[in-house]
Amino acid sequence: MTFSFIIVLLISRNSGLHAAELKLATIFSDHMVLQCDKPLTVWGWADPDESVTVSFGGQSKSVITSVNGKWFLKLDPSKASAKPQELIARGKEGRKLVVKDVLVGEVWFGSGQSNMAMAVGSANNFEAEKAAANLPLIRYYSEASLPADKPQAKGKGKWEICSPESVRRFSATLYFFGREIHREVGVPVGLVTASAGATHVESWLSAEVQSSDPDTKAEYEAQLKAWVGFDEAKFKADYEKKLAAWKFAFSMGKSSEKDKPSDPDRMIAHIKGKGGPSGLFNARVFNLAPFTLRGIIWYQGESNSGLPGSNQKHLYHKQLSLLVTSWRELWGDELPFAWVQLPNFTAPGEGWPRIREAMLKALELPKTGMAITIDIGDEKDIHPKNKQEVGKRLSYWALGTVYGKKVPAISGPLPTGSTISGNSITVYFKHTNGGLKSINGGPLAGFQIAGADQQWKPAVVEIKGDSVVVTSPLVAQPVAVRYAWKDLPDCSLANGAGLPASPFRTDDWPVPQVKK
């Protein structure tokens, strides 16, 4: 998908916007941050065939609008600046729009489900974080449009200046990441987010991408059919029947308050709030592109961990890869892209290990990174509160790879291959940063080894430089090894910087089915 094609797509889908007046895309508003050192795309609407001029930082560029009034132009790159400036758009008959208090710095987009949406107000040590949040050079924009069945050109959001009063609403993961970038790079930081709890990755992928890929087409069509077929009236009628049955059982002493059917209005709002396949891409991502960014952060996967196991174990890997490549195409830029690997948490089946594996495999894409969080989750809370460390680990990757800064490590250890010799398997790692080590100084736990019978046995592990040698007295001829392959695994292996190793497996045996 070329940049010119993206422009045509955006122009052709103006979703009912009638350009009777000069307008800028919603994200171009007071207190915004523009990306430094890259050409800046600015767009909006006016009358057809109208000349529009945009001025910023001592430069002016003009463009003639399309037949439906949409316009795009590119400003030359600007240096980072904490000095408030104005971005001005001018049209015919003296029409003018002025965006005030515009800074230039580093802009990152964060998206995903509830762990990306989780606010600073819900994270660890909020009172201390609140007191330290007088950081006016950090700005935050949250896109909050309702899910839609078609791509929407107009967004819903506003820029906020970081302060002790506003920070409680900011995405915790994105804020703690951005704060590290601000501290280390020393320029203004803009944080743009679009996220929604309990959402599948399918909600964030375009219909075109999902329906045209042979691996995702069937799943997309099944979800679309279920979404289109959702009958609100029938849903409420079914609730009334269930409620009547519960009342009768309750009166007979055969049921309790906890068995009462859920409020249908809340359930319907939850279903509609997530949207169908592509619903959040249409509403919250499409309108942001091609706003100039430095990179993207993704935190999602929990909801996809319940998909069927062995016959679709590849699907999240494919979907995440499509998300990266299709969003890059939409923006017309091979943006650096990192995600948070799912942390330790008590969940049924092998869904979480499978999603972690998919995330590990997706690192094959260029300019990607992953924060391994297998040691900082919460076994009972799917929303772990230590988002400070999540943001810091993401920042290590960005600072080390995007900005060329010296960091303790850009990642925890990642497996690069393995060899079998007699009764042992040697696994090799990269990102060891001073050598592998045991997190607690004791024997390495969480490793299992298996022979051709595919029966996993506890393993004995010896560290040798940047590799580990795995054996078991119960397996004479091993063929495969795995590490931390549980929802709530033993986490024992780290690099010299103390960052944990990613879970992995060397086999490709079918994964047991995971029930929804």
Residue ranges with predicted function:
Residues N14-A19:
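Sec/Tat signal peptide C-region and signal peptidase I cleavage site
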